[in-house]
Amino acid sequence: MLKTLHVRFMAKVMKRAKCPLVLSFLYLLQVIWWCCLPQATSLSFDYDFSVPGVLAGADLRYMNDSAALQDRIELTNYSRSWSTGRVAYGKAVRLWDESTGKVASFTSNFAFAITPATSNSARGDGMAFFLGPYPPSMPTDARGGHLALINNRDNPANKDSTRTVAVEFDAFKNAGWDPDGTNCHIGVNVNDIRSAETTALPDGFFNGIMSASVRYDAQAATLSATLRLDDPPGQSPYTVSANVDLRNVGLPQEAAVGFSASIGDLVE
């Protein structure tokens, strides 16, 4: 465990046999927005939820089953299956400028741990870092493997889907859209639950303290992520990158930034 905990999000997932899996998200969160936009200033924020009272005063929005506890945030409700949750920064962030066409760059660094409650607990679906419309809202049909990101397009009732760009940390293979050959991966998602680019991870990788960095390079129009396993240390990092123009893919000028997670009713 880290001695200094800056931000901690927690979610719990369960299988049909009622064996819970606890996913402790975000020990450390830092977001820096570099703005090259007219009438815009750079933005940065971080939170240390281990300090009493910081969580209560944090400018964060909680959606659906996410909830603030004393020193952490639970993204999903472990007591029931098919739970979803989102937590987003309370203010809009400026992605691009209509008059000039310029797009902002940013970086987000965070550390998290995924810890099974028992040694034989099955893996849940995972979590994601997302960008979407502001004010943020909760998808109505994005449970299980949809990671509370994008509505299930196999449901005819879901005619439209909110524009969303994300980096997913996927801990469970869904045969309908996840890549073959691996049960765990990181991916870049652009308006679709099927990742535009993925990097496979070893089975059982999401077990221990991990550090992640998500970076958008506006000049290169590239969204990339790096994931390291900190405990135990010494393993090489895993990276994923995709070409994404945040303006051209439909994200608004004023966007929401946050994290999402969902669980299903797992059957082994």
Task: Describe each model-derived feature in a short phrase.
Residues 2-268:
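Polar, low-complexity loop segments and adjacent catalytic/binding residues used for recognizing
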